[in-house]
Amino acid sequence: MDKLLRYNGVQEALKFLREDDERTLQEHLEMCQIPAPSYEEGEKAEYVRKKMVDAGLSEVHVDEVGNVLGTWKGTGNGPRIMVAGHTDTVFPRETDLTLKKEGERYSCPGIGDDTRAVAELLSLARAMNATGIRGEGDIVFCANVCEEGLGDLRGIKHVFKDMADTEGRYDGFVSIDDKKTSGIIYQAVGSERYLVTFHGTGGHSFTGFGIPNPIHAMGRAIAKISDFQTPKNPKTTFSVGVVNGGTSVNVIAAECSMLVDLRSVDAGELEKLSAKLHQAIEEAVNEENARWGYGTLSSESTGILDDNNMTAKSSVGDTAGAVPVNADNGNRETPAEDDRIAVTFEQEGRRPAGTQDKSCQIVQAANAANQAIGMETLYIGAASTDANIPISLGIPAITVGWGGKGGGEHTIHEWYEPVDSWKGPQRDLLLLLALSGYEGVQGYQLPCIER
């Protein structure tokens, strides 16, 4: 890092980034007023595409899923690095995006996460173009779609979908996506998200009494889930986050559903937890059916996986061939086979887990870049970000913070203050040059595949 800092071209670029801070803020504020919920980022993407062209990047284009990419060509055969910020926000299109200012604080939904990062990408590109500095390897700028929620990392999954393409592979990945400027996220929290729907026939709460109740079955399932035991290390968690169902107090619901979130930093633990969830739900359905005089159901699981939206579906509770058993089934003399409850699973999201050691090269390069700018590194460790995808594939990757101060992310009260905001892009410039190498000044710090 010392060699880079002594080079005039690098100092000129660092100076440019500080002087460009006002323009960066202006573009930042313009973008935060453009609606961009996941899967609807097109307007913001077009804004970014034009700015990338103006900044001097080459090969600027919007890919098949809506990612905006542009390349700053390297001088030789160094590692190919991607730096990314996501264009989507968590807010629906109809959200009021009126920008407010009190003192030095700006408020607008999505102003920080992750609009600030996209603005910094554009400033970085301008700095490289204005000063002419180039790494040994190509640096690809990516304003990607669908990082948030049920976007399920769709944009970066698409980028890394074909690992067999040696020419197009990346040797390293840096995501800008945190309010703590000096923060480094280097572990990937994996997640499995399921929409679980319980199906029955439904009926009147009095005259239909005695048929299995989907809401009761879901209640049984939730009770079982709440008793799960998971390890503290590796941290593994579960939550039923949303429940829906029912039409009235005097109605046995025909259908109800719940959204379940499972997380772990360890892929094996996540797989075990997912299996435990499926077993608990199957048991809950069988218990509710048996309570009202229906036999135990054999489970069947049919994996239907859509590679485009990563939605998996499976079913438990085929109603064919039921054998009523002795049970108190209320006023109903003969249980009907088609009254039994069945359940379907839909995988709403899947984010892979992965780990790297804090001492690995890309983490320590980011630490050195922080120190060079006068910041003390905050090792955040594990989170769920776009870096999950490359980390899970064994590609060196981290997520770092953007410049300035912010808070209230994922709320309509989200805010941003441009305090020392240039330090984020300055750190990123040094990090990218250290990773890709700077010919005649410093060799690259990441392994480079042969192309």
Predicted regions and their residues:
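Solvent-exposed residues in well-ordered beta-strands and their adjoining turns
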Residues: K73, D177, T197-T201, R263-V265, ...
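Metal-dependent amide/peptide-bond hydrolase catalytic core
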Residues: M1-N8, E12, I215-R451
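Acidic/His- and Gly-rich active-site-bordering loop/insert found
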Residues: D2-R105, N308-N309, S314-N329
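Short coil/turn connectors at secondary-structure junctions
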Residues: S58, V65, G76-I81, T95-D96, ...
